[in-house]
Amino acid sequence: MESQQLSQHSPISHGSACASVTSKEVHTNQDPLDVSASKTEECEKASTKANSQQTTTPASSAVPENPHHASPQPASVPPPQNGPYPQQCMMTQNQANPSGWSFYGHPSMIPYTPYQMSPMYFPPGPQSQFPQYPSSVGTPLSTPSPESGNTFTDSSSADSDMTSTKKYVRPPPMLTSPNDFPNWVKTYIKFLQNSNLGGIIPTVNGKPVRQITDDELTFLYNTFQIFAPSQFLPTWVKDILSVDYTDIMKILSKSIEKMQSDTQEANDIVTLANLQYNGSTPADAFETKVTNIIDRLNNNGIHINNKVACQLIMRGLSGEYKFLRYTRHRHLNMTVAELFLDIHAIYEEQQGSRNSKPNYRRNPSDEKNDSRSYTNTTKPKVIARNPQKTNNSKSKTARAHNVSTSNNSPSTDNDSISKSTTEPIQLNNKHDLHLRPETY
């Protein structure tokens, strides 16, 4: 009777019990799970047969559903409310969150080969700009990333801690050409910043603000793979991925360096076009500045020949250097080195003439001392000249008076005698005497 019951309850579908035994028909000392080996083999064969039938038979309403086996169902995505973009083009809060990717666990467990895109990631058609997102891939990037550690906060608590809530994050466009990669990577970096992942982006020195977590690296790899197909990547990006296909951080770092290089190129071109030199700075410094700019541009693929460089340099010359624009402008084969030889010659001549000129500039204190000493030395000379000038300015009558008085004095000198003979002598001849020359 026991065998009949076992045959009647033999398994007919996957997941059903192999034997059905009631407690009344089993001895008290017998284990209810104890089944003979032959019966066990029959159960296994029946189970294998049921599985083969289930895989080969297409799904229909006639096939009974197994209540003991629940296949994983994708999480339902709420439709966007008042969103400017269609639902298949948006990344909602239940998408793109690294913390929701529990089935990946680690970047090494990513179920995709390097840059082999699954058909589910291709755009639905040429009319759609962005690919459709499956509901099982990604959760929203609007949740803030932790500053440190590898644990992520719950979405409910993360929403309360957000400073600026963005329910929908617009994904970057698809890369369609290697030449568009510099512009595309800018939009991709902006996409990461809007997703609160700006801390993992390399800075100017090439290092991120914080360390990237495994879940964030997984998200970074998958989003880069989705929007940047391998056939449209530049050669230098493919070289990096050939070494490590998950090293997206190195690609971002190199891209930022190239952006800075492009900015430096633009600044160098503007500086070279607006050169000014009048000899106020050393000629060596001016030459070093110009040659460094030309070398950087040539190394970055912007070739500046000697003719263009000389024209730009001579256009900025002024002062005594201005005549170089007219004396050498017809020399088509002139090089930058020859032009700087002329600039150095003029600069050295200027410096030599400045050094040879005497310097008459004095301190104000020295000028005050010199003025005081000059007045002291000239004062006695003025005093010495004044008496002489007054003596010489005496009238002739006064001098004649002195001479007459000196003649009356008993002591006379030769000067007074010679002067007295010139004057007439009047004699009073009271006795009418006539003197004869012979008598005396």
From Swiss-Prot:
Q: What is its main location?
A: cytoplasm
Compositional bias segments (type: Low complexity): 153-165, 402-418
- How is this protein induced? Ty1-DR4 is a highly expressed element. Induced under amino acid starvation conditions by GCN4.
* Matches recorded under InterPro entries: TYA (IPR015820)
- Cellular compartments annotated: Cytoplasm
* Gene Ontology biological process: viral translational frameshifting
Listed A to Z, the keywords are:
Cytoplasm, Phosphoprotein, RNA-binding, Transposable element
Q: Where is this site: Cleavage?
A: H401, N402
Q: Which residues carry this modification: Phosphoserine?
A: S416
Per the record, which residues fall in region RNA-binding? 299-401
Biased composition range(s): Basic and acidic residues: 429-440
Q: From which domain of life does this come?
A: Eukaryota
Quick one: where's region Disordered?
Answer: 1-93, 126-174, 352-440
Q: Coiled-coil regions in this chain?
A: none
**Which intervals carry biased composition (Polar residues)?**
1-23, 48-60, 127-152, 419-428
Q: Name one GO cellular component term.
A: cytoplasm
State the protein's purpose.
Capsid protein (CA) is the structural component of the virus-like particle (VLP), forming the shell that encapsulates the retrotransposons dimeric RNA genome. The particles are assembled from trimer-clustered units and there are holes in the capsid shells that allow for the diffusion of macromolecules. CA also has nucleocapsid-like chaperone activity, promoting primer tRNA(i)-Met annealing to the multipartite primer-binding site (PBS), dimerization of Ty1 RNA and initiation of reverse transcription.
Q: How does it assemble?
A: Homotrimer.
Print the domain comment field.
The C-terminal RNA-binding region of CA is sufficient for all its nucleocapsid-like chaperone activities.
What else does the entry mention about this protein? Retrotransposons are mobile genetic entities that are able to replicate via an RNA intermediate and a reverse transcription step. In contrast to retroviruses, retrotransposons are non-infectious, lack an envelope and remain intracellular. Ty1 retrotransposons belong to the copia elements (pseudoviridae).
> Which protein, by its recorded name, is this?
Transposon Ty1-DR4 Gag polyprotein
Q: Which organism is it from?
A: Saccharomyces cerevisiae (strain ATCC 204508 / S288c)
Lineage, top ranks: Eukaryota, Fungi, Dikarya, Ascomycota, Saccharomycotina
